[in-house]
């Protein structure tokens, strides 16, 4: 009976969902010779031993794009299972950085609106990030006890509250 396979170590990777003033996201193309070469991804990279997730993301964006990350918020964490590796992709969303992103590691870059991104051009893990990015930031949930005749009034009040804010 063969021995059970050793569990693969999990590689923790950070990704930045960088949104510009027009609502576009920055994508980088994986270079030749790397896993999933030619596919597009959100910029970022691996954590180094002892590094915090934000420190890793800040370092990677400086190395790859020449920018200084000022702040980022968690968006989604995606566990990925590839035949050759296990991956935890930790995506953070930001519109706060200093500098103009430029390719410092010979990767192609492009800015696209989230709805313009074809999921098939992304790595499988990055498709989950795109899906999370496309979700609404807020949902309106009607109370369960609202009678049909009260729904119109309830919706009008919600509309008024939105206009005031």
Where do the model's predicted regions map?
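Conserved N-terminal beta1-alpha1 strand-loop-helix module at the mouth
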Residues: 132-165
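Active-site-adjacent beta-strand/loop module that shapes the phosphate/pyrophosphate-binding cleft
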Residues: 20, 78-100
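NUDIX/MutT-family hydrolases
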Residues: 91-95, 101-133
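Conserved Nudix-box catalytic region and its N-terminal flanking loop in Nudix hydrolases
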Residues: 24-67, 76
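Conserved N-terminal beta-strand and adjoining loop/helix that marks the start
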Residues: 2-26, 46, 77
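Short polar catalytic/cofactor-binding loops
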Residues: 18-23, 32, 142-148
């Amino acid at each position: 009976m063969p021995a059970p396979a050793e569990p693969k170590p999990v590689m923790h990777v950070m990704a930045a969902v960088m949104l510009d003033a027009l609502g576009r996201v920055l994508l980088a193309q994986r270079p030749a010779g790397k896993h999933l070469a030619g596919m597009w991804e959100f910029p970022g990279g691996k954590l180094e031993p002892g590094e915090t997730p934000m420190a890793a993301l800040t370092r990677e964006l400086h190395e790859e794009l020449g920018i200084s990350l000022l702040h980022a918020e968690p968006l989604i964490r995606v566990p990925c299972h590839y035949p050759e590796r296990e991956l935890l992709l930790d995506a953070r969303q930001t519109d706060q950085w200093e500098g103009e992103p430029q390719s410092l590691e010979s990767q192609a870059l492009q800015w696209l609106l989230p709805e313009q991104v074809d999921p098939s051009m992304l790595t499988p893990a990055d498709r989950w990030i795109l899906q999370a990015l496309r979700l609404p930031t807020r949902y309106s949930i009607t109370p369960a006890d609202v009678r049909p005749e009260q729904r119109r009034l309830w919706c009008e009040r919600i509309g008024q509250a939105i206009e005031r804010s």
